């Protein structure tokens, strides 16, 4: 008989909310909630970093404070530069004055809730839809209509170019994301009927690839203008496409082309990316 799941404790002041925050994700360092603490019609994202009982209390407070403030500072800086990221609503880096986890110690960051599907979900849907369309025309002498195929591929290319531009703006502002994956890119401002509310196994509906690219989850972010750091950011995203989106990977150059056009220092970053790739390949060969 399995034990009933007990939700982890929340930090104050969220413990007094009539409608408790909904736990969306739990990682090694933080928990992500959706909450209407401020206003029922104004949802927000709550990122809570609980204290670690296995760490020395002074070290724990220092590390937790450093990480939550680093994330908040990066977000505020990017917002000032006009880069689409969640707005910072509130931050507390000394919750419970460093008590252990049962006392809800740690730190939290309250952010704007970004409505929309993750790019990972949308691209997966596009790949399944393309496969379905190809199967539907299999056996036809003309195969898939060339104009249709070009149009569908241009849609995904356009999405990748938008991703490249927003990453270029991110790096131009001197911020490194640290965890660039398609799960940390959100498409905001589009109708979700063909994305978030569909059967994930459905392949008959054409996916909606429109919307503004919003960067989320800056838990590993840092401020840097080094080509190496920027190149590693791009390499992480490139590997994410290779592992999660094999059909779309062949269009990844669209990301890099748009990135190159986004700021003057992009060319040297892309040269460094070639070296990072070589190191990555050697590491894979060695194991």
Swiss-Prot record:
Among Pfam families, the record links this protein to: Kdo
Q: Name one GO molecular function term.
A: protein serine/threonine kinase activity
Alphabetically ordered keywords of this record: Activator, ATP-binding, Chromosome, Cytoplasm, Hydrolase, Kinase, Nucleotide-binding, Nucleus, Phosphoprotein, Serine/threonine-protein kinase, Telomere, Transcription, Transcription regulation, Transferase, tRNA processing
Q: What is catalysed by this protein? A: L-seryl-[protein] + ATP = O-phospho-L-seryl-[protein] + ADP + H(+); L-threonyl-[protein] + ATP = O-phospho-L-threonyl-[protein] + ADP + H(+)
Start-end of Pro residues biased regions: 1-14
- Mention one GO biological process in which this protein takes part, according to its record: tRNA processing
Q: Which residues of this protein are catalytic? A: 179
**Which compartments is it annotated to reside in?**
Cytoplasm; Nucleus; Chromosome, Telomere
Q: The organism sits in which domain of life?
A: Eukaryota
- What EC designation does it have? 3.6.-.-, 2.7.11.1
The family note in this entry says: Belongs to the protein kinase superfamily. BUD32 family.
Q: What does this protein do?
A: Component of the EKC/KEOPS complex that is required for the formation of a threonylcarbamoyl group on adenosine at position 37 (t(6)A37) in tRNAs that read codons beginning with adenine. The complex is probably involved in the transfer of the threonylcarbamoyl moiety of threonylcarbamoyl-AMP (TC-AMP) to the N6 group of A37. BUD32 has ATPase activity in the context of the EKC/KEOPS complex and likely plays a supporting role to the catalytic subunit KAE1. The EKC/KEOPS complex also promotes both telomere uncapping and telomere elongation.
Comment on protein domains: This protein is considered an atypical serine/threonine kinase, because it lacks the conventional structural elements necessary for the substrate recognition as well as a lysine residue that in all other serine/threonine kinases participates in the catalytic event. BUD32 has protein kinase activity in vitro, but in the context of the EKC/KEOPS complex, the catalytic subunit KAE1 switches the activity of BUD32 from kinase into ATPase.
Q: Which PANTHER family match?
A: EKC_KEOPS COMPLEX SUBUNIT TP53RK, NON-SPECIFIC SERINE/THREONINE PROTEIN KINASE
What is the name attached to this protein's record? EKC/KEOPS complex subunit BUD32
